[in-house]
């Protein structure tokens, strides 16, 4: 059984974070809004979607960044390097979220990604088989396995859903009215797997997504969200 609640992975601040914290205190910079870095694997789909959470009344800075790494373990391992010299002060509310899919990751790769995230204090938004399963949950309570991303998109494009959907298209406005429904469905699926003592970060957890936790967190930082 998962022992991390709803995947709020915790751990020590990375060496890079400690160095930046010392530099920040020495320079006496004034307080700024916390920054949330979303390290996303390759595709613009996730980048385009999460950019829409950046609103004027949001009290965090949301910065989606594409990663050059396709494997989950490398994406998480190199997350600190991916943000480069950008400010990262976890003690002031900054967070790093690693957003990735099952894709060709083995269970060993997924386990390593989880282990590294815990060690570094990062968070994970994992989707199995792909990010589009999160979109699909806005329209259908999908609890049976979906073979791959193509099959997921085929379900997503059924009549009454996102019939014109293509990778990297803008879908936020169409999904927003159904977002709370998707969150509820995603969380129930995670809970069901946990009750069965099944590991979430495996190929066998299909279908599942922990994107709902990230969406809830981003919404909680918007003053206009109800």
Summary of predicted features, one role per range:
Residues 68-71:
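Short, charge-patterned binding micro-sites
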Residues 41-43:
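Helix N-cap/beta->alpha junction signal
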Residues 1-37, 46-47, 51-66, 85-97, ...:
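C-terminal accessory helical subdomains adjacent to catalytic cores in phosphodiester-
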Residues 76-85:
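Glycine-rich, highly charged phosphate/nucleotide-binding loops
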């Amino acid at each position: 059984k998962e022992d991390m609640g709803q995947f709020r992975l915790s751990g020590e601040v990375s060496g890079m974070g400690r160095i930046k914290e010392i530099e920040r205190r020495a320079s006496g910079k004034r307080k700024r809004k916390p920054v949330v870095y979303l390290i996303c694997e390759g595709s613009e789909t996730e980048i385009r979607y999460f950019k829409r959470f950046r609103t004027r009344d949001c009290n965090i800075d949301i910065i989606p960044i594409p990663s050059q790494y396709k494997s989950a373990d490398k994406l998480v391992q190199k997350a600190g390097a991916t943000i480069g010299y950008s400010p990262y002060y976890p003690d002031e509310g900054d967070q790093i979220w690693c957003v990735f899919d099952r894709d060709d990751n083995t269970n060993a790769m997924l386990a390593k990604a989880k282990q590294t995230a815990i060690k570094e204090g990062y968070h994970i938004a994992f989707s199995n088989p792909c990010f589009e399963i999160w979109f699909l949950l806005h329209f259908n309570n999908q609890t049976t396995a979906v073979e791959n991303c193509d099959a997921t998109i085929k379900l997503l494009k059924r009549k009454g859903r996102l019939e014109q959907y293509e990778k990297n298209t803008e879908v936020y406005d169409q999904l927003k009215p159904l977002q709370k429904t998707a969150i509820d469905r995603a969380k129930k699926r995670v809970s069901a797997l946990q009750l069965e003592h099944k590991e979430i970060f495996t190929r066998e957890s299909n279908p599942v997504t922990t994107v709902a936790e990230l969406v809830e967190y981003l919404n909680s930082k918007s003053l206009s969200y109800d």
